[in-house]
Amino acid sequence: MDALQNLLDRNAQWAARVSSENPEFFRQLAAQQAPDYLWIGCSDSRVPANQIVDLAPGELFVHRNVANVVSHSDVNCQSVIQFAVDVLKVEHIMVVGHYGCSGVRSALTCESVNGVADYWLGHVRDVA
C-alpha cells in the first residue's frame, strides 16, 4: 500500500502546485476537451505523449498500446479513432513510434513473451 500512497501523495502535490500556478486550470480543464490531435502511440513508460510534444492536458487525445499497433480487429483502438473523429472532431491522427521499442523488438526477434502479448505482437510480425 505504501507504493500506492506514494502515488496519491504525489498527485496531491502536483494538483496543489498546478492550482497555485494557475488557479483556473482544473475548472477550465473540466469544462471540455477540444484536442486537435489524436496520438496513437506505444504504452512504453519512457514516451509520455503530452510531455514530449509540450502540450497540456486536454490538448492531445491519446491511445496507447504495446508497439503502437493499429489493427482492424482492435475494437478499443477503432472506438478511440471513431470517438476522436466523430465526437471530438480532431484534425490530425498520428501513429507515433519510438526508438528502442521493446514490443517491436520482441515481435521482430520472435522473442516469446508468452500469453496474449504474443498474439498482439503477431500484428507487428504480419507486416514486418
Model regions: which residues?
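Gly/Ser/Thr-rich loops at beta-strand to alpha-helix junctions
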Residues: 44-46, 98-103
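Glycine/charged-rich beta-loop-alpha catalytic/anionic-binding loops adjacent to active sites
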Residues: 57-68
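Short beta-strand segments
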Residues: 40-42, 64, 94-98
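Divalent-metal-activated hydrolytic enzyme cores
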Residues: 1-35, 67-91, 101-128
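N-terminal short beta-loop-beta anion/metal-coordinating cradle
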Residues: 18-59
